Amino acid sequence: MTSRRWFHPNITGVEAENLLLTRGVDGSFLARPSKSNPGDFTLSVRRTGAVTHIKIQNTGDYYDLYGGEKFATLAELVQYYMEHHGQLKEKNGDVIELKYPLNCADPTSERWFHGHLSGREAEKLLTEKGKHGSFLVRESQSHPGDFVLSVRTGDDKGESNDGKSKVTHVMIHCQDLKYDVGGGEKFDSLTDLVEHYKKNPMVETLGTVLQLKQPLNTTRINAAEIESRVRELSKLAETTDKVKQGFWEEFETLQQQECKLLYSRKEGQRQENKNKNRYKNILPFDHTRVVLHDGDPNEPVSDYINANIIMPEFETKCNNSKPKKSYIATQGCLQNTVNDFWRMVFQENSRVIVMTTKEVERGKSKCVKYWPDEYSLKEYGVMRVRNVKESAAHDYTLRELKLSKVGQGNTERTVWQYHFRTWPDHGVPSDPGGVLDFLEEVHHKQESISDAGPVVVHCSAGIGRTGTFIVIDILIDIIREKGVDCDIDVPKTIQMVRSQRSGMVQTEAQYRFIYMAVQHYIETLQRRIEEEQKSKRKGHEYTNIKYSLSDQTSGDQSPLPPCTPTPTCPEMREDSARVYENVGLMQQQKSFR
C-alpha cells in the first residue's frame, strides 16, 4: 500500500457521492468516517455510474465489514480488497471492485506540501536534496487528518552538533479546520502556519532552532488541482531576478539530472551508421533502440535506425488490465533512411504514425517525404506503400496508407499517418486545444486496432516535439484510467521518458506547454462530467455484503465502544515509535534576521 490518501476525514455520504460521480470513474473508491456510528468507517465505491456505500466496523480489536475477514488496520482492509478482486460481493453475487483510490484534496497548493510521504522518505529527500533549513510538510500516516512538518536541522555536511538526527519532525494537528503544533496559536491554513514559523522559528527543548529557510518542493500533483499548481509555478520569483520562477526552476532542476542518464549510444556512433543520423550527436540509447531484424546478412549495420522504444512505467492496480500503450520515438526520415523507416513500421506492427513537423521549416529540411502521393503506390526497398486517401482536418492531415512487403502477395496492413501541421516554427502553440483534439483522435484510432504495435512519433530530431507529444499522451492516459483525482508528476514522467531516449522535451516552453495541455484537458473533462451528472440519479444507500470466502464466520457484532484507536497504516508501524518533537514544550524565538 503506497498511499492512504483515499481516506477523507471530513466528508458526508452525499459529498462522497458527489466526489465519486464528478471526479471518479467506475471502480473509484474512498473511505470516510461514519456519521451514524462515530468510530466506524464507510467505504464508498463507484459502480456503473452510481455509488455503493459499505459499512466498516472497528470493534476496538479489529476492522471488518460486519463479517468475513478481519484486519488490524483500515489500510490493510482496503489493500486486501483491492488486491483480491471477486472477494467483495453483494447479496445478489455482483462483484464490488476497488480499483482506483480517489485521493483526498490537498489542503494547500503550496509546492512544499508533499502529500503522502513517510517519515523515512522525508528524511531521505531532505538529506539528499536539502540543506540546513530545508523543510517540507506531509500527511501524517499514523494520525489520518493530521500533518507533519519535517525540517533538516543538521549542517550541510549532514551532521548536527549534538549528534542528533539531522531531520526533525513536528506534528501539525488539524481540528475544526484549524492547524496548530500542539499548543499556542491556531491557524486557518497550513500556509499561514508555515509562514508564521518561518518568521518566528520554533526551538526544540534541547535548544535546537528549527529554522524554515527554504522549502523542498514537490513535483507531484493531484491532477484535479493542476490549475492551482500552474498558478504557483507562474508566480514571479521574490528576488529581483524575475526570470527564475517556478517553471524555469522545475525545468532547470530536471536538466541537472541529465548526468544520471548517460547510457551508451555506441551503435549510433559507429562509422557505418553516421550517415543515418540527422544530427550527429542526437543518437539512440543502445538499451532501448529499435533493432531491425530483416536486414541484409552481408551488411552488419543493416539493423540500425535512429529510434527508441518508449514504454510508460506507471503503476496500475488492475491485475487484468490490457498492456499499456507504447511508443517509438524517432527522427524525421532522411533520404537514405526511408526504407529502414518502413521496415521498422512493418516489423513492430505499428498502425499509427504521428508526424509533428512540416517537411521544411524556416527553409531547412526537417523530414523528407516518406509516403507516396494520394492514390499512388511506391516501393521503398522491400516495402510497398499505397496512399489510399488523404483528408484534411483543422490542424492536421490524415493519410490512410496500405503497407505490404514485396513478394508476400496482396497481404496489406492499414497504417494511419496523422500529420500535425500547425505547430509554429518558433515556440509552442498558444492554445493546447488543437494538440489535445489531435491526440484524442490518435488515441481512438490506436484503441480501435486490437493488435496494434507502438505508436510511431517523430518530428525532426525526434526529441523535442516528439517528447512533448508523448509525455502529454502518457499523462492523459493516466487520467483516463484513474480519474481526474489521481496523482501525476510531470518532471518524473519526463525523466522516465528521457531514460529511454535522451533529451526528450527540449525547452522550458515545451515543458510549460505540457502543464497547460493537461490543465486544459482536466478542465474540459470536468465540465463534461458535470453535464453528464446533471441527468443521472444519486447513489444507493448502504448495501449488504456477501463474501465469496470459504470462511464466512461472523465477527463480534457488539456495539462499538465510544472511543476507538486511530487506524495506523501498516507501512508506518515501525515508525510509530518515532518521537515527534513535543512542540507544546517548545519556546518561540524571534527571527534572528
Curated annotation (Swiss-Prot):
The EC number(s) this enzyme carries: 3.1.3.48
Domain Tyrosine-protein phosphatase per the UniProt entry, residue ranges: 247-521
Composition bias type Polar residues, residue spans: 548-557
Region (Disordered): 548-575
InterPro entries xref list: Prot-tyrosine_phosphatase-like, PTP_cat, SH2, SH2_dom_sf, Tyr_Pase_AS, Tyr_Pase_cat, Tyr_Pase_dom, Tyr_Pase_non-rcpt_typ-6/11
An annotated Gene Ontology molecular function: non-membrane spanning protein tyrosine phosphatase activity
Reaction catalysed by this enzyme: O-phospho-L-tyrosyl-[protein] + H2O = L-tyrosyl-[protein] + phosphate
PTM description: Phosphorylated by tyrosine-protein kinases.
Catalytic residues (UniProt): 459
Compartments where found: Cytoplasm
GO biological process: cellular response to epidermal growth factor stimulus; ERBB signaling pathway; negative regulation of chondrocyte differentiation; positive regulation of ERK1 and ERK2 cascade; positive regulation of ossification
Residues passing through the membrane, by range: none
SUPFAM superfamilies: (Phosphotyrosine protein) phosphatases II, SH2 domain
All residue ranges annotated as the SH2 domain in the record: 6-102, 112-216
Ubl conjugation keyword on record: no
Compositionally biased residues, Pro residues: 559-568
Known tissue expression: Expressed in embryonic fibroblast, hematopoietic, erythroid, myeloid and lymphoid cells.
Keywords of the record: Cytoplasm, Hydrolase, Phosphoprotein, Protein phosphatase, Repeat, SH2 domain
GO terms under cellular component: cytoplasm; nucleus
Keyword Phosphoprotein: yes
Residues binding substrate: 425, 459-465, 506
Family: Belongs to the protein-tyrosine phosphatase family. Non-receptor class 2 subfamily.
Job of this protein: This PTPase activity may directly link growth factor receptors and other signaling proteins through protein-tyrosine phosphorylation. The SH2 regions may interact with other cellular components to modulate its own phosphatase activity against interacting substrates. May play a positive role during the stages of erythroid cell proliferation.
The protein's name: Tyrosine-protein phosphatase non-receptor type 11
